[in-house]
Structure formats: C-alpha cells, structure tokens
Amino acid sequence: MAVTLDKDAYYRRVKRLYSNWRKGEDEYASIDAIVVSVGVDEEIVYAKSTALQTWLFGYELTDTIMVFCDDKIIFMASKKKVEFLKQIANTKGNENANGAPAITLLVREKNESNKSSFDKMIDAIKESKSGKKIGVFSKDKFPGEFMKSWSDCLNKEGFDKVDISAVVAYTIAVKEDGELNLMKKAASITSEVFNKFFKERVMEIVDADEKVRHSKLAESVEKAIEEKKYLAGADPSTVEMCYPPIIQSGGNYNLKFSVVSDKNHMHFGAITCAMGIRFKSYCSNLVRTLMVDPTQEVQENYNFLLQLQEELLKELRHGVKICDVYNSVMDVVKKQKPELLNKITKNLGFGMGIEFREGSLVINSKNQYKLKKGMVFSINLGFSDLTNKEGKKPEEKTYALFIGDTVLVDEDGPATILTSVKKKVKNVGIFLKNEDDEEEEEEKDEAEDLLGRGSRAALLTERTRNEMTAEEKRRAHQKELAAQLNEEAKRRLTEQKGEQQIQKARKSNVSYKNPSLMPKEPHIREMKIYIDKKYETVIMPVFGIATPFHIATIKNISMSVEGDYTYLRINFYCPGSALGRNEGNIFPNPEATFVKEITYRASNMKAPGEQTVPALNLQNAFRIIKEVQKRYKTREAEEKEKEGIVKQDSLVINLNRSNPKLKDLYIRPNIAQKRMQGSLEAHVNGFRFTSVRGDKVDILYNNIKHALFQPCDGEMIIVLHFHLKNAVMFGKKRHTDVQFYTEVGEITTDLGKHQHMHDRDDLYAEQMEREMRHKLKTAFKNFIEKVEALTKEELEFEVPFRDLGFNGAPYRSTCLLQPTSSALVNATEWPPFVVTLDEVELIHFERVQFHLKNFDMVIVYKDYSKKVTMINAIPVASLDPIKEWLNSCDLKYTEGVQSLNWTKIMKTIVDDPEGFFEQGGWSFLEPEGEGSDAEDGDSESEIEDETFNPSEDDYEEEEEDSDEDYSSEAEESDYSKESLGSEEESGKDWDELEEEARKADRESRYEEEEEQSRSMSRKRKASVHSSGRGSNRGSRHSSAPPKKKRK
C-alpha cells in the first residue's frame, strides 16, 4: 500500500510559512531564500530540519534538500521519495489555489551527476529576490557525501547565511486541531504510564523496602510502553520515549532534562521523576515528586511550588509576552518566600511540539516572543538544594522538589493542563507508620485482650476532648446530612407541585359499535353460545337476547358435569372483585350495574332425532373461550411491555474493521429460549450484539446509565453489564438491564472423581484456569480501553469495589452486593441488582438488635412514588463498613429495631407531603433523643405504630394491595400461565394454624417479661437501640434475652 501525504495539511502549512516570511518580521526580513537539507544520522533525534519536514509532509525524508524561493519550491530526493512528493507536485497548473508556489522535483543520483541539479537549485536561489542571503538552520549538521557536496557548493557561491531556527519554530508553534489531538493523546499516555506503572511500582518498592537502582527503574518504565495496557488504546509502534526517564533521590538532584538516571539505590525521601512520551512524532512531558513521610516544612515548600504553578498557568494567556509570565512568578517568590529565590529553576518551561524542547520559546526573563492561542508548553518548576532540618543521614539532609505538566495556551483564562495526574500532597505523599507507633498499637491490643473492658475504659479516659472517634465523626456528618435532606426534599416537592401527572387513557373494549355489525350465525339464532374470534367476543343468550361480552370482561370460566347435565360457569370482572396485579382499574364507569356471573346448563342426553348432545355447545364454548382468552392476554402483555418505550436513534455502523470487538459472549436476558453465543462490537454511537443465528441487539452509548465491568476475580463469570436509562425491547419483553458475559473455568464439579492434592491433571487444569482468567481479563480490559478512547471517555466503565462488598438478599437468594463510584450493584446473579446512588434519598436499617445475627436495609428514593428497595439478611458484621461507605458518599442513614410498613409510610408522604415535612420529615426514623423533633416523637406515632413482623405472606399482600404500580422490570411475571379456574378461597392448612399458635404463645410470654422490665428500662440511659414499643415485636428471631452488647 502506497504511503499517502495529507495534501490539505501541506498546502495549509506551506502557505503559513510563506505568509510569515512575506510579512518580513525578525530574521525573515533579511533572507531571499530558505535552504533546508536533511541527511542520515541515527543519533540525531530532534532537529529543526526534520521537524519542518514532519510538519509539512507527516514524515522524515532523509537525504533530501528543500529550497524555498520567492516564487518556486524545489525538492531534491531519491527516486522513491520523489514519487511520494508527486502527490503535492501534480496539481492543476502546478500551483495550488491557495497561492503556494509551484513545486519542482529533482531526482538525486548516486554518482557525481548531481552537479546539474545543484546548479539548478543555485540558479533558483540567485533569482529569488536579491539572491544573496539564505535562511538556514545553523545547528543542523548532517554527515555523508551527499550533504558535504551540497554544503561545498553553497559555500563556493558565497551566500550569506542567516539562522532562521527561532522564527520557523515560532511559525510552527501554533498547533492545528489535528496536532493538538495528537499531543493530547501523547499526554494521556504519559499520564497512564505514570499512574498505572511508575507510581504503583514506587509504592511496591517502598512497601516491600526493596533496593532498586534509579537506572533499573528507568529501564522498566521504558519497557512499560511496549505493553498495550498502558497505552490507552494506542498502537505501540507509534509510541516512543522523548528521552530516557529521569529518576533522582537521596540528595543527588539535577533538575534538567539532559541528565541520565544514575546507578544509586532509590532513597525513600523526595523521589523526582521526569518522563515524556512521543505519539506520532508529537511530544508530551510530565514531572512529579513522590514524597515518603515528608516533614511539615517539606509539605509547606511543596504547596508553595503548587501555588507558583497555579500563578504560571494564570499568566499563560494569548498575547502575553513570555518574559512577563516569568517575571510575574518571580514576583510571587520575592514577596512570599524570598529565601527560595536562588533555589528555583532558571527557566520555568519551554515550547513543545514535534521537537521536545524549543530553545526559542523558553520561559525566562529575556524572551520577548508573545504567546499565541494553540501553543503547547512543558512547564517545569522546581526547588533544588533545599535543606531538611530533621534529616540525620547525608542523603536525607538535601532534597529537591520538581513538578511539571504539558499545557495548552487558551485565548482567555488560564492554560489547560493536558497531563491530568493529581499532584496534591495527599496524592503524591506516601505516609508510613513508624515502628514505634506499630509497637505501641500492638501493646494496646495485647493489653485489651488481657485486661478486657476495664483496661479499655482506662485507655479511653486518656483521650482528649478534641479527639473524635470514627463513630462520632459519622454522627456529626449525619446530623448535617439530615438537615440538608429535609430542606432538599421540601424544595424538590415544591418544584414538582405544579407539574400535572399525565393520566393514562383507558382502552375501550367495545366489541361492536352498532348491532348491524354482529354476526348472523345459526348458533345465535338457536340461542347457543357463540364465540366471535375476529372481534374477541363471546355472544351469550341472556333472557332470550343475544348479548355480546368482550373477552376482556371475562375473569375466568369453569365447567363441571353433574349427573345428566353439564354446567358452564362464567365469572366477570366487576367493581369490588379482587384484581390481579397486572389488571389495574378496567372500569370506565364503576357506578353502572354489572353482571358478576352467569351459569348455563345443558343436557348430556341425546334427544330423539338430534345428531349431537346439547352439552356439546358448552364444551366447545369452554375450549374456544380459553383459547381466545389466552391469545388476548398474550397480546395485551406484549402491548404493555411496549408501553413507554422511548424510540432510540439508529445505530451508526462503523465500517472500519478495527472496531473494538469481543467474541464468544452470552447475553442475559436470553434472546431465545436457549442461550446463544455471539459477539459484541462497538460502533460510532453504540454497541451491537450479534448472535450466531443472526439476532441483533443494539445499545446506544447515550442510553447507558451505568456501564459496569465485573472482573472474574472470585467469580465464575466475567461480565460487562449495562444499566439503561430507557428500556429496550427484545425477545418480546422490555429490559433496562442487559449484560454480556463469558464463563471462566468449570461451573460444575465432578464429586465422584478421585482427587489427590498432587494429581498432575488437577494441577494442570488449575494452571490452565489461571491463564484463562488472566487472558479473559486482559481481553475485556483492552476492549473497555478502546471503547473509552472511541467515545472520548463519554462512556466510562465502573469496576465494583470488592473490598467494600457485603452479602445480602435483594431478591430471593443471597448475593455479594458491591459499591461502585456511583451505584450499588450485583451483576453476577440474575436478576441483577443496580441502585443509582444519586437517586437515593436515604437508607434505613431495620431489625438492628444486639441478639440478631443479621439486619435489613431499606433504600428510599428521591422519587417518592417509586417503591422502596429492600435488602434482607445482611450480616451484622457488615453494618459499620456500610455506614462508613454511606457516610463517605454523603448519604443519610438511620436505624431502628422495628420493621416498618413502607407501603403505608410512602402513601402517607405522597398524599400529604407538606404535612409530613411540617411534622419533622424523616426525623421520625431517628432513634429517640437524636431526632430534631424528639420531644414530639408521639406525634408521628400513627406512622410508627404501623409496624409489623414481615413474613413472605405480608410481602405478597403489600405487592397486591399497593396503590402504586411498583412492578419491577427485572421481575418476570408468568401471568399468561395463570390458572383461569375458579378463585374460591381455601381454608388455612394445619402448618399455618400451628405456626399461629406458636406465635401467640411466644407473644404472651414476651408480654409478661416486658411488664417486669419496663420500669427498669425507663431509668436506663437512652441508647441508639433502645425502644419500648419495638423490643418484643422486633425480636422474632430469638426467644432468649440479649446476653452481650455488640461493639
């Protein structure tokens, strides 16, 4: 494939070069032609000549001479390079419409016949303007015969040479959008390598107290850029280091980029690291100082350095002189810390682009160039030869601080930092515990174990008043959150007050709009039951009149044979009858008179002359009504699923074959009855899953609320889970949770297999599984990184924090619930569990009692019409970690010993929100003595007294009787398979009656104990968990009184 040249970019840039030359400013004013020659030298990394070539053509062209005259451009190169340059030479009239001069191409020969080509170029120089002065890059000297002969030819003619390095650098310093994108990418790769490799490696070295040489660590950083996981999706062949990484510590510091990492061992003090990565010829730079146990003075100096960088960023604006930027920073040093004036670096940074360091754009006191929008600088500030007064060893006494970033000059406001690596003390400081502190802690622990509570109480008395325990800090923060919670809820309800709720239009079930549309069948005339399948109507004789009933009005039917007769009983829906969860209110006029049931009787005996028995009509009617009813309910269910579905944009397919793609994945929920494998591919605006049989599921990026990546650590599957903003339809159902997963290892274990701990097959299988896990994790991570790069990080995948996870039962089975940065999730079990933290109003812990091993967690949403979420059976050991996590997320939590009837509580709030907040709002959940209206605690007793001990039956009743439609989309209802038979209630069975008797006995025993302890409990000090009303009713899991307190 031929190498292509970006013609538009070439014409744009050569026009800019000529435009600046013709303006005649600075060195441009005196030159008649520009001569640029590039030879072959592997040791030269940065040169103006090669930078100009890369800027114009996108590539370096060795052994090439470029002569820019006033009215023409001449390129002399090898035959292959001339073919490449023909892409810009062969234009209409050999001159670009933008006014770029015509191009002449000369082929370089390998023998001495180049003289004629040299003469042509010399003649062109002489004809350009005055033909005496030529602009050259005086520092660029390339070896080789070709370069020497050309240099001799120029010297022979006696042209005056003017160094134009600075003015050309200023011309190409302003970056176009394409160049800025490359520099941003280079900066992001540098940040990735620093964060994910270097910083982590230094932490490991410090933690393990390893001895590692600076040079070895620098080499490992260079090797890291060969691994794709640190390159943010970039091709490794396009990435290289700008210079070998510079790592310094232990008193030997030189804050320049020309030094090399020495072979000394890393000292755990101030560790400076400078690294720069080049992406597609464009450079970036990053400098950070990692500090191990910094003293207060070191931290103060470091914070002052950050302050200076902020000042520098503010001054880097379009139109400001570079020397003014430098002077303003120096003024801050003189005013605030003049003793550091001789310690600061001589310059504060330099321009950067294709060349790492642009010598003419150094930020110092002498540079008169003005900054322009689109310029990119590497800003580097540091203090060297600082003295650590607390240092004892020679390497501890002297330290240096050095920070640097790649920044972009904007038109207004401070410069934009492209290397987004955090640099505050808390981010770069590594704080270790002293051995003495650790010994003291161990001694305290031992003392507690030996002496028990007496010693603990003695140690607690030593605490000063200013010290606060974690629990006290949490409580203080929770009080602040409680005040904010009620205020925000009031404001939110006030805003929503004016919003009208859209009432759903009821579907009309009129079979025939007028009598003429009724069918004229013999069955109807013969006063038999007839089913009109087309209009889904049952026509029955009522008082001798054929009366149509739509299938939607029929609740159920039953048929029975008694003696010589067959009975067909038809039950209808009517006001007052129990409706199923999915039926809703289907009566447009509930005040009308309704038929509740009709029973028909027919003889089983054949009359003389009749071919069939009369009961055959009832038998056929029973069968056909069942069929029509089933078809109608199935269709209604499908229509209900489609209700409220937001129409999605069409997926824009990316025809590029290098799209991020994952193969051999399963989808949940299944598209068909049987699970099928397929592939997930990222396109321009969304994902497409294609199964092996061709089914397609599209998920758009803008419809994804949470994108979760659940690694396979400790799990049997590896999952990509998408929680959607609006439901999507596939498999005839709507889904707000879609996930793609693959299994890791064997889900089942052969228990009959003979196992031995040293069995080679087992060891090999374990090794294979480990490798498979690693391979899958790498594949998924690469996919995620590519997708994030493709979407410009608009879509970010969250990884659950397994360390913060806790067990609970949000549905029927217990699973591990794990927080992410914005949600609480479980993606490995099905149905999945996802709660968005931004939508949560507060969390309430129920059944928190000393003698119970677990408790329940209730999640109340900001949308009060939404059903609360219950997580049952959470181990008590998880209570404090959950509180700590919720507190860190600024979420209000409360706790109590009782189980509350949340359906009634939420209905009370929705019916009268103003009254609810006037009575103190959510403070009724606070334990006695802590709520803001504790003294008026009895005023809310109406709500609090609605407590009960929930059993499975209670939860079912809540769901049935709820006025709100709380049905979750994750739940799969099987109402299409509901029995259509008689709904006669059956009596309670023996097990239920025995259970009720046991409960009655237990409650009577508790009431006796309660009477004895009530007088004592009033005298005790009120604590978080003491509640007179709930003490006997909440303790349904234990018959024994509490024996010990939980810490």
UniProtKB/Swiss-Prot annotation:
Subcellular location, record wording: Nucleus; Chromosome
Cross-link type Glycyl lysine isopeptide (Lys-Gly) (interchain with G-Cter in SUMO2), residue numbers: K497, K513, K647
SUPFAM superfamilies: Creatinase/aminopeptidase (SSF55920)
Residue positions where N-acetylalanine is found in the record: A2
Tissues expressed in: Widely expressed. Expressed in brain, liver, heart, kidneys, lungs, spleen, thymus, ovary, and testes, with highest levels of expression observed in thymus.
Gene Ontology cellular-component annotations: FACT complex; nucleus
Keywords: Acetylation, ADP-ribosylation, Chromosome, Coiled coil, DNA damage, DNA repair, DNA replication, Isopeptide bond, Nucleus, Phosphoprotein, Transcription, Transcription regulation, Ubl conjugation
Residues annotated with N6-acetyllysine modification: K139, K196, K223, K513, K732, K786, K904
Domain notes: The C-terminal Glu-rich acidic region is essential for FACT activity.
Protein task: Component of the FACT complex, a general chromatin factor that acts to reorganize nucleosomes. The FACT complex is involved in multiple processes that require DNA as a template such as mRNA elongation, DNA replication and DNA repair. During transcription elongation the FACT complex acts as a histone chaperone that both destabilizes and restores nucleosomal structure.
Protein name listed in UniProt: FACT complex subunit SPT16
The species this protein was found in: Mus musculus
